[in-house]
Amino acid sequence: MTITIIAPPQADAAAPAPGNRPGVAHIDPNMKLVTGTFCSASEDWFEEPLERGLRLILVQSGQLRCRIPGQPEHLIEGPSLCTIANDGDFTSAQIYGTDKPLRYTIVQLGVEALDSRLGWLPEQLIRRPGGDPRIMSCPAPRAMQALASQIATCQMLGPTRDLYLGGKALELAALSAQFLSGEGRPVEEPRITCSEVERIHAARDLLVGALQEPPSLDTLASRVGMNPRKLTAGFRKVFGASVFGYLQEYRLREAHRMLCDEEANVSTVAYRVGYSPAHFSIAFRKRYGISPSEIR
């Protein structure tokens, strides 16, 4: 696949708003990759045209609300995969959370990806001629989150970087196709009630609010009125990871954000997210493929 690189902004181009880091984009006639971080200080809805084709939006952190014609309002909170299928002239509207930056990776595929004969789109995304856009969202698997982090932290330059990112965009599209077709999902998913979902989110809030000294699984389950087995199964259903897996991923994501956005040194960041410096360096390199000192 030939990839044409969009030229970077010129020196005299308008600078992005403080805290907003638009990513580079890679395009061919049927694929585009965009990645970046967006910080919003506005609580207004923002409208933009919907591109024709299939848009795979991986929200790594942060949240937004999305409206598209003919569909109920969607709340998307990272880590999530949101998929929009559109073959008409429509507009979407978004409002972004202001409490934390939105980290995102988007792969836009052409209208050919909407062909139901490909067999990988779920029923709710199948093209209906002349119909409204279709949207669905679900927790993002860890493999997708890892890919997005590799894209965001790519250290290569020039043509090598372009080739690497183009390949990662294809890999992310393939993973999404596998996941949406059901090949990447467990055969049987645990059933949870709305009340249990609320308790699972409460457990998540307790967990991320105590990164330095997180409660044990038994304590956490007791505090939200669930048993450990049900809480673990619910975490996998809602967040795509076990309680421990989610905690580890959240710690490393927060550490990555701190290293990128704050002035703290590596040791300070490690302690703030509940690691010793030695264990932090090992876990960080395993997760992102680079040492934390390479970012700092």
From Swiss-Prot:
One Pfam family here: HTH_18
Alphabetical UniProt keywords: Activator, DNA-binding, Transcription, Transcription regulation
Annotated GO MF terms: DNA-binding transcription activator activity; DNA-binding transcription repressor activity; transcription cis-regulatory region binding
DNA-binding feature ranges: 218-239, 266-288
Top-level taxonomic group: Bacteria
GO cellular component: protein-DNA complex
Role played: Positive activator of the genes for pyochelin and ferripyochelin receptors.
Name of this chain's protein: Regulatory protein PchR
Organism: Pseudomonas aeruginosa (strain ATCC 15692 / DSM 22644 / CIP 104116 / JCM 14847 / LMG 12228 / 1C / PRS 101 / PAO1)
Gene: pchR
